């Protein structure tokens, strides 16, 4: 079976494993976008570390969960988000201003909405987690 959206499948696996109180989850196939998205989640402490296993096929990622993640998801299609519309998107996607992050792909790489605001760049929206 061909997966149309690898990032959506990966985040759905993580969310389902978190709901079942699992400590680890296996994600396959892996992609560069999925790895960068997981790096943003690690930076903010929502998941533990992960390991990429290259099996010369699609690749696998083993993610250690720490029980802090409530929900994560992908926004499809990837809408353009200028800097002045960033507040509107964060208020629509996140439950509160105190926690949660919207992940964007920008010209400076994949980053969360706070870092994009600090660097004063807009981009396309990938997903969210809180």
Curated annotation (Swiss-Prot):
Disulfide bonds: none annotated. InterPro entries: Ribosomal_uS8, Ribosomal_uS8_CS, Ribosomal_uS8_sf. Keywords: Ribonucleoprotein, Ribosomal protein. It comes from the Eukaryota. SUPFAM superfamilies: Ribosomal protein S8. GO terms for biological process: translation. PANTHER family: 40S RIBOSOMAL PROTEIN S15A (PTHR11758). Belongs to the universal ribosomal protein uS8 family. This is Small ribosomal subunit protein uS8. It comes from Paracentrotus lividus (Common sea urchin).
